[in-house]
Amino acid sequence: MDPFITEGIPEEYAILGIGDIHLRVRYTEPTQKILEDYYGFKKYNKFKFYDRKVTLFRFEENLFKHEIHIIEDKDSAVERNGVGGIHHIAFGVKDIEDLKELQEKIEEKNYFNSGIKNREFMISSYFREANHLLFETATPLIKDKKIIPEQKNNFDEIPLFLPKFLENRRERIEKNINFKF
């Protein structure tokens, strides 16, 4: 996805994306291998944070300069979904052909996976790796005006877009979005 550029904010001050992602895992090697072999991340630093080994990876091939910190943690309980946990980590590919190529690699390694799914606004594949992290890989957004609403300057003016398969749950989803902790 391209960054949202507006006249009111010069590009050098714009928020372009998420800074770092920290993945706390028991076994670092399987996750590191996926980042390097499947997504093109490069290991660029290692250090200790208290008693934990941390390995830093960077993706230099795009505007966002994504960075992932893998923290080795053999002591903490395995993460469960809920407050403080993440459901999945998402990556992008250039097109459907790249996604199909990645899907073949995933199936060759026998990762538990979803297969390729049409999500209306993008096409995705999901798989779980050895540390039980769920990886999503998606094509770029389909920029069809009928499917995706225009971006607005004010966040509260953007209508909630749901794919057709979730429309029957719209009321419940909107209620949960408005939930205050």
Regions found by a protein language model. Give the residues of each.
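Glyoxalase I/VOC metalloenzyme domain signal
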Residues: 1-47, 59-112, 127-181
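Short acidic/glycine-enriched loop/turn segments that link adjacent beta-strands
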Residues: 50-53, 119-123
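Minor-groove-contacting beta-hairpin "wing" of winged helix-turn-helix DNA-binding domains
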Residues: 55-57
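Extended serine/threonine-enriched, polar tracts that run as long, contiguous segments within proteins
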Residues: 114-117
